[in-house]
Regions:
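Hydrophobic alpha-helical transmembrane segments in multi-pass membrane proteins
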Residues: 26, 30-34, 68-84, 106-111, ...
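Conserved short-loop catalytic and cofactor-binding motifs
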Residues: 35, 88, 157
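Interfacial helix-capping/hinge residues at the ends of transmembrane alpha-helices
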Residues: 45-49, 80, 114
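Short polybasic/polar patches that bind polyanions
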Residues: 52, 84-86
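Membrane-spanning alpha-helical segments of multipass transporters and channels
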Residues: 81, 91-215
């Protein structure tokens, strides 16, 4: 891979750099399927053993799985960092710690997504189907399967791409690599946090409705 320079002498994004971070986002999003299956299986195990989980114990179980997902995400980030720097010779630059923090926060969202889908679905097939569908949509809009330039040329996708957290992650990282001074990094950090909060709020509403029905 060759590092190119634009007319202003600022560094542009190479294909190796672009797909390093785009595919890392895809890898971390895959953590949602792992967490979703774990949450579903634990829920089913409690059902088989006729153990009715209290609201507190269910929340504790969800948080423990989310913590596991974050740990898995951190390990994935470390592995990708080692591989891309040593093998692909990708230079993460002076913003390495910011990039790592960004992907850890995205790991929080991915884990929360998997946990909420896992606790909400009644079959493991539904868990896998819903998460795979969400993953595909987020990734295709975010530029994991093609460059963002190609997405902007598709009439419908160039409107929907703003809904993908991966789009904001890729855009923020690319601007930082190019040395541009924007607030996109803050935006890309806040979006996964806000989405995680919304998912948690949704799960609380569902549980309260379930408790009112049981009563």
């Amino acid at each position: 891979y060759v590092v190119s320079e634009n007319i202003n002498g600022k560094k542009t994004v190479t294909s190796a750099e672009y797909y390093t971070f785009a595919e890392l986002a895809l890898i971390i999003l895959n953590v949602s399927t792992v967490i979703g299956e774990l949450v579903y299986k634990e829920k089913q195990l409690n059902t088989i053993n006729r153990i009715k989980m209290s609201k507190v114990s269910e929340r504790t179980m969800i948080f423990s799985k989310i913590a596991l997902g974050i740990i898995i995400s951190i390990l994935q980030i470390i592995l990708v960092y080692i591989y891309t720097t040593l093998i692909l010779k990708v230079n993460w630059g002076e913003n390495t710690l910011k990039f790592i923090l960004l992907f850890i926060v995205f790991g929080l969202f991915s884990s929360m997504l998997g946990a909420i889908v896992g606790i909400s679905c009644k079959t493991d097939t539904a868990v896998a189907g819903i998460l795979n569908g969400i993953m595909y949509l987020i990734c295709i809009l975010g530029g994991c399967f093609s460059t963002r330039l190609m997405i902007t040329k598709v009439p419908i996708l160039n409107k929907l791409m703003y809904l993908s957290p991966i789009y904001w992650i890729n855009t923020a990282i690319n601007t930082m690599i190019c040395g541009l001074d924007t607030n996109l990094y803050l935006v890309s950090i806040m979006i996964p946090i806000i989405l995680s909060f919304l998912l948690f709020s949704y799960s609380e509403i569902i549980k309260r409705r379930g408790e009112s029905v049981d009563d």
